[in-house]
Swiss-Prot record:
The chain crosses the membrane at residues 120-142, 150-172, 197-225, 250-271, 272-300, 420-440, 451-473, 505-531, 555-573, 574-598, 613-635, 636-651. Detected in proximal tubules in the kidney, in particular in basolateral membranes of intercalated cells in the cortical collecting duct. It comes from Mus musculus. Residues 1-55 are annotated as: Disordered. Residues 1-119, 173-196, 441-450, 532-554, 599-612, 652-1083 are cytoplasmic. Keywords: Cell membrane, Chloride, Deafness, Glycoprotein, Ion transport, Membrane, Metal-binding, Phosphoprotein, Potassium, Potassium transport, Symport, Transmembrane, Transmembrane helix, Transport. NCBIfam families: 2a30. It is found in: Cell membrane. This is Solute carrier family 12 member 7. Its main location: membrane. Activated by N-ethylmaleimide (NEM). Inhibited by furosemide, DIDS and bumetanide. The inhibition is much stronger in the presence of 50 mM K(+) in the uptake medium. Inhibited by DIOA. Inhibited by WNK3.
Length: 1083
């Protein structure tokens, strides 16, 4: 019986002794007076108000007044004295977030309230007893015994009670693992399994509690309309066939009225519900005692309760008083009222029903007593279809052929089809309610002792009551009476009430108030559970239900609960509502067992339950039994409940706030990750499994914000959530000075990764210089077999500016590091022009310029990009370069065949490059590059002059490039080069720098370009011209990236070559293979 919320007012209090405790409650630094209205710390995660050592707020002077602990003075800010910590622990009250005051605070002043703490018997045992015993025991248990028989009924009850006992053992382990927060099973599950499981199971538990309220209200109305006041029915059946529909309509009307009345009572004040709790409990106890007293009485004085049978069929004793066809009156024989029900007249010659005419009417005792031997007749099941006759086994009957069942005949018929699994679903709600003690944990003297003891004792007691009642019902009551759900054969009396002593009204009135009180407590507890979930903030759309009245009463949650409860009342059938809430409670219990099993198997250091009588096998058995019972009850209800829980889980995972509750699922994930990492090969992957595992190198500005966020957009387009992505960056400085900036930078990167939907890991390094930091990232990023094989970085656009934090020297060194590590390198040039994830290219080309083969990565990257919606409509074109002595036609055929085997569709074009003379532009471009390099080395320029000189040379190179096609004259000699330096300025520099010899400037004017540089520049210029001619309008151009020179003296020239190679192109991706990445033609 799942009334899992018996609400008791929780007052702020101080557990102190004597005057010292009273004084502590008045001091502002006491544990009770710490502001608990804002349970959300700086990380945004609500925490339980617990005595964590970093939350102790006491003035530093009080720690070391005598200077005895001056040695530890520096640690006092974060680590308190042991005496202070123990004081906090001793005065800790386990009031957690989500716990609200259930009674109005008549005066708003904070004062000490010495509320009596409850022990095991009052605080746990009796509430569990009250919540477990209830409506199913009074209204359906006799019917279950009649349909399933004693043996199968015993099996049903044993399975359900075993399930709850195993769940109680798991719950006891969880509840005794530390101070128990008030809040019940939701807090235990959510803090053990994490916010996703906690929210999903919490909502299922809430729905179960809400539908439980509907079930109790329906039970209350059924008792009222069937056994207390049948004349109060609004809808009357015109025929016997319409009685069931009329009853359902009456249940809907009266149930809705009862729900509205109960909701008003709960809204006005829950204190009235709490005051009536003892009355409801007394009703339950008296009813149970009356049942046992009635059983004992049947042993020596069975009650006289006749049941009329026609043949072997049970008759509904409503419109006749004599169980006979005819009776003798004044020496004459006359027909009875029963005759007139089956015949068309009262005369002996009237036409009667064929079955009535051929079978005799007999009368048996409905409750023959314990000593009657009826137990053997009730031992086995008697399942039947809907509308079947309730027949007594072993009684002879004359069958009739092709009998039609005319309406109006007073037979007792079954209203629903009965079978084993259906009875399990109807019965299971009667064993729920084991969480009542944990919901009162905030008001217990010793919750870690009371919850296991009280809960397990309550389950043992109720299991004994249920099992003994099954045996006693089977031994005392006739089978046809047991199968008579509504007591029609007993003139409409409650079957279990007829057994009770001293009067049937003890059971009728007791069960009425018991179910009424259970409904009130469900409507009290369910809104508070929803309010606790809403206040946790894990489900954003439920946050409105976290608000309530000024005193904390959950008004909006109560309104939603009443609406959901109304849907259950509109179903109107107790037998249809019971399996629904069975699903939700079974799911809740399943995850309680899962939480205990996971924590035990992981052996986490904080898993130290005080309750020792648990084992992971018991929890696993309980979880399996819950899952089995779900599908036994109703496989489609089970799938629907699991679908709801799964949707809630994914919603919380997708939209919910990030919570860190130290849950077991995180530990399980870590164990699974460790196991998977140990299985991953440390060597290179197989050819067929190779994919780029990317380390993205980001640059940060002075505010620790990402300079080029579109680099992450490009990463998500390239990876599409598959494989490994590590986003790294370097901060210059020492870790002691920069750890705050490092944390802020990591938060900025993570938020940008989330915005760009880049799934991966963030790794930030603080190093004395950027060069070493980048090298450390390339060497150490990743773990075990999960290491990157590709480095993605942005081209340093302003590399010619000497004060650029990521200078060209760092860039070239990073290129060398990736080459040494045999890793691929991707350099995105003009990264700010790359598309964001929201953009779409409706047309265009991705051009691949395949100059040298370094593993086939150039062809793999466009294929991966085109899987993303941004690049999906772009065509792929592959260009390769042919020299004069190459057969370009055969090259094109071979390349097309190669792509065919690679299963890549792309246009192929072979571009011929004629070896002509080195142009004047190339010679001058090389000269400008070398002159600039020499000048910057030889002249000690100021920062502003150096920048201006670099810009002037850059401008002249650009102007030279625009007029290169019109030049036909021979390469200019060095003396024709126009320099911005005058002779006077050079003399002034010479006097300023005495150590600079005059030969340096003389060499500057007689400089001749190096022939290898001229050849490289010639290649760059020629290739750039060819690429511009073919791919200037391409959406993306992929090019082989030349390797850096072996000598570091040519690093700056290398940067200039790359600049010339890619000049004039919008989006360029320079690709340098590491030698290990491959693309294969094999499957």
């Amino acid at each position: 019986m799942p009334t899992n919320f018996t609400v008791v007012p929780v007052e702020a209090r101080a557990d102190g002794a004597g005057d010292e405790a009273a004084e502590r409650t008045e001091e502002p630094e006491s544990p009770e007076s710490v502001d608990q209205t804002s349970p959300t710390p700086g990380d945004g995660n609500p925490r339980e108000n617990s005595p964590f050592i970093n939350n102790v707020e006491v003035e530093r002077e009080s720690y070391f007044e005598g200077k005895n602990m001056a040695l530890f003075e520096e640690e006092m800010d974060s680590n308190p004295m042991v005496s202070s910590l123990l004081n906090k622990l001793a005065n800790y009250t386990n009031l957690s977030q989500g716990v609200v005051e259930h009674e109005e605070d008549e005066d708003s002043r904070r004062r000490e309230v010495k509320a009596p703490r409850m022990g095991t018997f009052i605080g746990v045992y009796l509430p569990c007893l009250q919540n477990i015993l209830g409506v199913i025991l009074f209204l359906r248990l006799t019917w279950i015994v009649g349909a399933a028989g004693v043996m199968e009924s015993f099996l049903i009850v044993a399975m359900c009670c075993t399930c709850t006992m195993l769940t109680a053992i798991s719950m006891s382990a969880i509840a005794t693992n530390g101070v128990v927060p008030a809040g019940g099973s939701y807090y235990m599950i959510s803090r053990s399994l994490g916010p996703e499981f906690g929210g999903a199971v919490g909502l299922c538990f809430y729905l179960g509690t809400t539908f439980a309220g509907a079930m109790y209200i329906l039970g209350t109305i059924e008792i009222f309309l069937t056994y207390i006041s049948p004349s109060a029915a609004i809808f009357q059946a015109e025929t016997a066939d319409g009685e069931a529909a009329a009853l359902l309509n009456n249940m809907r009307v009266y149930g809705s009225c009862a729900l509205a009345l109960m909701a008003v009572v709960v809204f006005v004040g829950v204190k009235y519900v709490n005051k009536l709790a003892l009355v409801f409990l007394a009703c339950v106890v008296l009813s149970i005692l009356a049942i046992y007293a009635g059983v004992i009485k049947t042993a020596f004085a069975p009650p006289d309760i006749p049941v009329c049978l026609l043949g072997n069929r049970t008759l509904a004793n409503r419109n006749f008083d004599t169980c006979a066809k005819m009776q003798v009156v004044s020496n004459g024989t006359v027909t009875t009222a029963l005759w007139r029900l089956f015949c068309n007249g009262s005369s002996l010659g009237a036409t009667c029903d064929e079955y009535f005419a051929q079978n005799n009417v007999t009368e048996i005792q409905g409750i023959p007593g314990v000593a009657s031997g009826v137990f053997l007749d009730n031992l086995w099941s008697t399942y039947s279809d809907k509308g079947a006759f309730v027949e007594k086994k072993g009684v002879s009957s004359v069958p009739v052929s092709e009998e039609s069942r005319p309406g109006g005949l007073p037979y007792v018929l079954t209203d629903i089809m009965t079978y084993f699994t259906m009875l399990v679903g109807i019965y299971f709600p009667s064993v729920t309610g084991i969480m009542a003690g944990s919901n009162r944990s905030g008001d217990l003297k010793d919750a870690q002792k009371s919850i296991p003891t009280g809960t397990i004792l309550a389950i043992v007691t109720t299991s004994f009551i249920y099992l003994s009642c099954i045996v006693l019902f089977g031994a005392c009551i006739e089978g046809v009476v047991l199968r008579d759900k509504f007591g029609e054969a007993l003139q409409g009396n409650l079957v279990i009430g007829m057994l009770a002593w001293p009067s049937p009204w003890v059971i009728v009135i007791g069960s009425f108030f018991s179910t009424c009180g259970a409904g009130l407590q469900s409507l009290t507890g369910a809104p508070r559970l929803l309010q606790a979930i809403a206040r946790d903030g894990i489900i954003p759309f439920l946050q409105v239900f976290g608000h309530g009245k000024a005193n904390g009463e959950p008004t909006w949650a109560l309104l939603l609960t009443a609406l959901i409860c109304e849907t259950g009342i509109l179903i109107a059938s107790l037998d249809s509502v019971a399996p629904i809430l069975s699903m939700f409670f079974l799911m809740c219990y399943m995850f309680v067992n899962l939480a205990c099993a996971v924590q035990t198997l992981l052996r986490t250091p904080n898993w130290r339950p005080r309750f020792k009588f648990y084992h992971w096998t018991l929890s696993f058995l309980g979880m399996s039994l819950c899952l089995a019972l779900m599908f036994i009850c109703s496989w489609y209800y089970a799938l629907f409940a699991m679908l709801i829980a799964g949707c809630i889980y994914k919603y919380i995972e997708y939209r919910g706030a990030e919570k860190e509750w130290g849950d077991g699922i995180r530990g399980l994930s870590l164990n699974a990750a460790r196991y998977a990492l140990l299985r991953v090969e440390h060597g290179p992957p197989h050819t067929k499994n190779w994919r780029p595992q990317v380390l993205v190198m980001l640059n940060l500005d002075s505010e620790q914000c990402v300079k080029h966020p579109r680099l992450l957009s490009f990463t998500s387009q390239l990876k599409a959530g598959k494989g490994l992505t590590i986003v790294g960056s370097v901060l210059e400085g020492t870790y002691l000075d920069k750890h705050v900036e490092a944390q802020r930078a990591e938060e900025n990167i993570r938020s940008l990764m989330s915005a760009e939907k880049t799934k991966g890991f963030c790794q930030l390094v603080v190093s004395s210089n950027l060069r070493d930091g980048a090298s450390h990232l390339i060497q150490s990023a990743g773990l075990g077999g999960m290491k990157h094989n590709t480095v993605l970085m942005a081209w340093p656009e302003a590399w010619k500016e000497a004060d650029n934090p990521f200078s060209w020297k760092n860039f070239v060194d990073t290129v060398r590091d990736t080459t040494a590590a045999h890793q691929a390198l991707l350099v995105a040039k003009n990264i700010d022009l790359f598309p964001q994830n929201q953009e779409r290219f409706s047309d265009g080309n991705i051009d691949v310029w395949w100059i040298v083969h370094d593993g086939g990565m150039l062809m793999l990257l466009p294929f991966l990009l085109r899987q993303h919606k941004v690049w999906r409509k772009c065509r792929m074109r592959i260009f390769t370069v042919a020299q004069v002595d190459d057969n370009s036609i055969q090259m094109k055929k071979d390349l097309q065949m190669f792509l065919y085997h690679l299963r890549i569709s792309a246009e192929v074009e072979v571009v011929e490059m004629v070896e002509n003379d080195i142009s004047a532009f190339t010679y001058e471009k090389t000269l400008m590059m070398e002159q600039r390099s020499q000048m910057l080395k030889q002249m000690q320029l100021s920062k502003n002059e150096r920048e201006r000189e670099a810009q002037l040379i850059h401008d002249r190179n650009t102007a030279s490039h625009t007029t290169a096609t019109a030049r036909t004259q021979a390469p200019p000699t060095p003396d024709k080069v126009q320099m911005t330096w005058t002779k006077e300025k050079l003399i002034a520099e010479k006097h300023r720098n005495k150590d600079t010899g005059p030969s340096g400037f003389k060499d500057l004017f007689s400089l001749k370009p190096d022939q290898s540089n001229v050849r490289r520049m010639h290649t760059a210029v020629k290739l750039n011209g060819v690429v511009l001619n073919k791919s200037q309008d391409a959406q993306l151009v992929l090019l082989n990236m030349p390797g850096p020179p072996k000598s570091r003296q040519g690093d700056e020239n290398y940067m200039e070559f790359l600049e010339v190679l890619t000049e004039g192109l919008n989006r360029v991706l320079l690709v340098r293979g590491g030698g290990r990445e491959v693309i294969t033609i094999y499957s």
